[in-house]
Amino acid sequence: MLGDVLNTQELLTLATAIEGHPDNVAPALLGGLTSSVFEDGKVYSVKRNVDETLCFAAIVPDYKLLTEAARAALPKEVSHKDAVYNLSRAALVPAAFCEGRHDLLAIATEDKLHQPYRMPLMPGSKEVFDMARLCGAKAVYVSGAGSTVMAVAEKAEAEKFYSKLEKGLELLEGLDGCEAFTLLRLDADNTGATVE
């Protein structure tokens, strides 16, 4: 990454010390799908390449959701049942996104720990979820703390998916306090940060 200056581990640790969240730093630096933990001043991170037959739609509303407000919406405690629900689905994420198991995408992205609490702060988000599924999304989820919603589709159907989603989002404009949505067509970046 930075050649002789810093190795990848040193760069991850330094960037996490500055930014504070290895789950933000690792994917930006490494690309792909990452799992990361910051423990005793060190980042432990695993990277896998995202299946290149997938495409992504970032659906960005015209309002901002402050991270502080999104964090404050989360409960201080969660039930054991909800924790197990999320952990079991998180275990499916690598197979769904990296091993071509598209049949697992929807269930792997189901959530009971943050989306039910944050979506009420995101006007129109439930309708966006429903519209994306109606347009052919294999999975839909809140990106980070919100307010962006991500939808996942198969590249073989990308043009049809994006076209239908664009038209569908136009129908949702003005709904529930959201005047407009921006649709970003994305592919996974399995390379991460580079220096030229």
Predicted segments, located by residue:
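A glycine/threonine-rich phosphate-anchoring loop and its flanking beta-alpha core
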Residues: 36-46, 50-69
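Solvent-exposed alpha-helices and their adjacent loops that cap or buttress functional pockets
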Residues: 18-20, 26-29, 47-52, 85-86, ...
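Glycine-rich, charge-dense phosphate/pyrophosphate-binding loop(s)
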Residues: 97-196
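Gly/Ser-rich oxyanion-binding loop with an adjacent helix/lid
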Residues: 1-44
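Short beta-strand segments
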Residues: 28-31, 37, 58-62, 142-144, ...
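Short beta-strand scaffold segments in enzyme catalytic cores
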Residues: 25-28, 33-36, 57, 149-151, ...
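Active-site rim beta-loop-alpha module in soluble metabolic enzymes
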Residues: 57-120
